[in-house]
Amino acid sequence: MKFRSLVKATSQALTNLGYTPLFPNLDYSGENKDVALTIKEKNKLAWDHYKAVEEADAVYFILPQGYMGTSCKIELGYALALKKPIYYSEPTKDIGLDGYPKKFISLDNLIEFNDEFSRK
């Protein structure tokens, strides 16, 4: 997974705000890169992410410098098919992708999720 350390930090920040982030396989490797060595392994990791999309109330895409890789694009399509609310950390600068999020919520301003979801 690219940007693993950033995803871990974001997961912790969301937890601190009272959310339950579903970021599968964060501890699969300490490396910030794709570490699957076989197609079978890659498929297993991908399906773990699709299951998290199914279970999520909303899907937040962490997009450093607007980068969205192939796996994220597939997850985006799946989330859209499931009619999940979509959020991006920043625009991708691709109008084909930037029309989908309900809102852009920067990594520095995750508290904005409290405005999106009623906190009782």
For the regions a protein language model found, what residue spans apply to each?
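Conserved catalytic or regulatory cores that recognize and/or transform ribose-phosphate-containing ligands
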Residues: M1-K120
